[in-house]
C-alpha cells in the first residue's frame, strides 16, 4: 500500500518536503501515545539480539545517520523497529546546510542524490535533546555521528571535532567520526592517514570510554581502505562504518539528463550495494573479529542484511530504502531475518 501511495502521491512532492512531513509524523508517535502500541507490532524476535560495542542491540539492523539529523525522532524510530538509531551528522556550530534544492530522487535506481551539507542545530542543542532521550524508559541504542563545521578551516578541524565530542559523548551510546561526506569542502581529505591519525587520537581521548567508530567513503582505493582499517585497529577504535555515499555515477538506469541536472552530491541507495559489500569484505579481512564493522549502503531487504552479516558485518544500517519502502521497513527486515534463520 505504501508503494502505491509513494508512486501516486509522495513521489510528486519535493523530496525534502516529503522527508519533513514523514519525519514530523515519526516525531509525533510517542507524543500521541502510539509508541508503545507500535512496539508490540514491530518488536524484533529476541533471537535477533546482538551484543556489540559493549551494548545490547535488539536486532542487527538500524537506521543510518542522515535521517534524524538532530536527534528529534529517536524514540519514534525505535518504535518502528530499528535496533539502533544513529543521529546526525552533528557539527559543533549550528549551520543551515547547502542551498536548496539539495535532495533528488532517482526513481529508476531506487536511489537518492543529496548535498544537504550537514544542516543541523549544533552540538549544544543536540546534547540537551539527547540527554532527555537517554532518560526514556524504552529507546533504541543511540549512536551520534559528528563532523567538521563548514565554517571551520580543515587545518582547525580537530579542535572543532573536539567541541562536538565533549558535548555529545556523554549522551551517546557510541560516537562516530564522519570524515567521508562529499558535501563539505575538504572533509574527505581527512581520510588520509597523516590527517586521520591525530584527529582520531584526539577525539578518542576526548570521548573517554565511549565506543568510537570512524565512517569512511566507498570511493577510497582498496589500499586506502586497508590503511584506514589498520589505523583503526592500531588506535584502539571500537569500529568502522562502511560506507558513506559515493560521488560515482556509474551504471545508473536513470536518464543521464536527470542525473546531470541533480548535480553534485553523494549518491545513496541500490547502486551502492556492490561497492559497499566489497568494502565490507575488504575491511573484515584486515581487522580482528572483535572489531565492530557496521555495513551501510544499498541495503533494501532482509536478504541484503543477512548477506552483509554473512560477509562479516557486526551490524547493518540503511536509510535510502526507508524513503522508498515506508514506515514498516524495519519490521519487514527483522521479520524477514527471522524467517531466513528459521529455514
From Swiss-Prot:
Subcellular location, record wording: Cell membrane
Active site: 181
GO biological process assignments: 'de novo' pyrimidine nucleobase biosynthetic process; 'de novo' UMP biosynthetic process
MF annotations from Gene Ontology: dihydroorotate dehydrogenase (quinone) activity
Residues annotated to bind substrate: 69, 114-118, 178, 183, 244-245
Key word Chloroplast present: no
Domain of life the protein comes from: Bacteria
Cofactor note: Binds 1 FMN per subunit.
Function: Catalyzes the conversion of dihydroorotate to orotate with quinone as electron acceptor.
NCBIfam families: PRK05286.2-1, PRK05286.2-5, pyrD_sub2
HAMAP family assigned to the protein according to its UniProt record, in alphabetical order: DHO_dh_type2
Protein name, per record: Dihydroorotate dehydrogenase (quinone)
Native source species: Leifsonia xyli subsp. xyli (strain CTCB07)
Amino acid at each position: 500500500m505504501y508503494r502505491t501511495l509513494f508512486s501516486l502521491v509522495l513521489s510528486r512532492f519535493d523530496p525534502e518536503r516529503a522527508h519533513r512531513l514523514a519525519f514530523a509524523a515519526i516525531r509525533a508517535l510517542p507524543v500521541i501515545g502510539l509508541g508503545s502500541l507500535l512496539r508490540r507490532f514491530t518488536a524484533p524476535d529476541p533471537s535477533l539480539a546482538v551484543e556489540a560495542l559493549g551494548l545490547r542491540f535488539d536486532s542487527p539492523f538500524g537506521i543510518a545517520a542522515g535521517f534524524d539529523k538532530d536527534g528529534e525522532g529517536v524514540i519514534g524510530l525505535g518504535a518502528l523497529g530499528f535496533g539502533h538509531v544513529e543521529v546526525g551528522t552533528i557539527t559543533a556550530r549550528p549551520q543551515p546546510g547547502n542551498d536548496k534544492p539539495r535532495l533528488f530522487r532517482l526513481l529508476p535506481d531506487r536511489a537518492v542524490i543529496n548535498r544537504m551539507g550537514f544542516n543541523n542545530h549544533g552540538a549544544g542543542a543536540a546534547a540537551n535533546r539527547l540527554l532527555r532521550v537517554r532518560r526514556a524508559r524504552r529507546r533504541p541504542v543511540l549512536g551520534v555521528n559528528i563532523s567538521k563545521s563548514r565554517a571551520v578551516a580543515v587545518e582547525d578541524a580537530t579542535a572543532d571535532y573536539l567541541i562536538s565530542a565533549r558535548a555529545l559523548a556523554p549522551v551517546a551510546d557510541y560516537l562516530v567520526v564522519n570524515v567521508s561526506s562529499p558535501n563539505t569542502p575538504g572533509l574527505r581529505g581527512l581520510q588520509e592517514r597523516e590527517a586521520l591519525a591525530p584527529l582520531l587520537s584526539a577525539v578518542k581521548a576526548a570521548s573517554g570510554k565511549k565506543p568510537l567508530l570512524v565512517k569512511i567513503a566507498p570511493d577510497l582505493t582498496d589500499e586506502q581502505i586497508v590503511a584506514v582499517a589498520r589505523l583503526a585497529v592500531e588506535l584502539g577504535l571500537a569500529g568502522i562504518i562502511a560506507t558513506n555515499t559515493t560521488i560515482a555515477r556509474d551504471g545508473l538506469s536513470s536518464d543521464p539528463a536527470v542525473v546531470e541536472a541533480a548535480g553534485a552530491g553523494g549518491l545513496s541507495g541500490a547502486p551502492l550495494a556492490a561497492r559497499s559489500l566489497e568494502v565490507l569484505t575488504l575491511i573484515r579481512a584486515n581487522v580482528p573479529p572483535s572489531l565492530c564493522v557496521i555495513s551501510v549502503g544499498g541495503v533494501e531487504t532482509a536478504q541484503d542484511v543477512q548477506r552483509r552479516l554473512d560477509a562479516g558485518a557486526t551490524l547493518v544500517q540503511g536509510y535510502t530504502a526507508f524513503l522508498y519502502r515506508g514506515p514498516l521497513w524495519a519490521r519487514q527486515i527483522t521479520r524477514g531475518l527471522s524467517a531466513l534463520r528459521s529455514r
